[in-house]
Amino acid sequence: VLLRGEVGETYNIGGNNEWNNLDIVHLLCDQMDARFAADPSLAQRFPDAPGSSGRSARDLIKFVEDRAGHDWRYAIDASRIMGELGYKPHETFETGLRRTLDWYLSNEDWWRPLLPA
């Protein structure tokens, strides 16, 4: 976009995939469960997490009444940036979410102070 995009134009950057919100939550929970299964030290660092007691992170999901105008899914059409500028994503949604989760698990000192007391 910086080198080939036109000034004043808008480009959606994405992977041309669509997920509903609940599927994203399930994916995140499943990835968290896999981390706890693979790394026993996480149970010591996060003793209140479901994975610490052998439960699934999905146990934390609570269904509530939707707010008016609730978006049940989000989609980005990146065809313009792909066609005009040759953009191609380097990550799938799944690998990007996995890398994000791994970053948070590796950088507890950054996010822990942000939690409410």
Briefly describe each language-model feature range.
Residues V1-A117:
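C-terminal substrate-binding subdomain of Rossmann-fold SDR/epimerase-dehydratase oxidoreductases
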